[in-house]
């Protein structure tokens, strides 16, 4: 199975049928997205949190309370279901992780408002096309992600620290990586930090908070991008009564072409 050539519809069908795999490298050319669903009485607070923290929380679409599909799935919107079409989910109750199911249907409520947030997996295909290596993608692994010491701007009852994803980039190609990804602001855009991880509160780069440990070559430099797992750090810090998210690295694959998020 060549996961890069599978259509978004086919990918969602496989995940709906129970396949659990990180989605880096799937359905090349199409945008991937983070998900968080929260009770309606917290929806404004999260919308404000995202507006105040656009690097980690670039909103692609907001669904009405109880809605389970959106326009980002294009002509296939009614076929899609955000409760089943990511490979794996995380269920939080009062900030505690209580389950990591392959389907969120059993936890769904009609008062949940869902936010679909841009994901950096979207710009990995353009990086590869430009000859910039993406180590975890080459190895079929999940991207490493870390909670930093950098506080997000709070909103209402919601607060938490920035989460970043790491890609080890050859020093000679860091400028290329910055140039390419800066053209995709709706999916986190340019890096937020390059170099020494300790400067953003990461003590051990080989022990990520989410995902797999990084792979690197001797000439590589650590490059960090804002990450859509930041809302999960916010959930663990703010302890809302219920939140449904994707599992880190296990994204919703949309029908939106990645070039649609590229700016000049």
Curated annotation (Swiss-Prot):
Record keywords: Lyase
Repeat keyword on record: no
GO MF term list: lyase activity
Signal peptide segment: none
Keyword Lyase attached: yes
InterPro entries cross-referenced by the UniProt entry: D-Glu_cyclase, Putative_hydro-lyase, UPF0317
Transmembrane annotation, as ranges: none
Entry EC no(s): 4.2.1.-
Broad EC category: lyase
Family: Belongs to the D-glutamate cyclase family.
Name under which the protein is recorded: Putative hydro-lyase Cgl2544/cg2803
Species whose genome carries this gene: Corynebacterium glutamicum (strain ATCC 13032 / DSM 20300 / JCM 1318 / BCRC 11384 / CCUG 27702 / LMG 3730 / NBRC 12168 / NCIMB 10025 / NRRL B-2784 / 534)
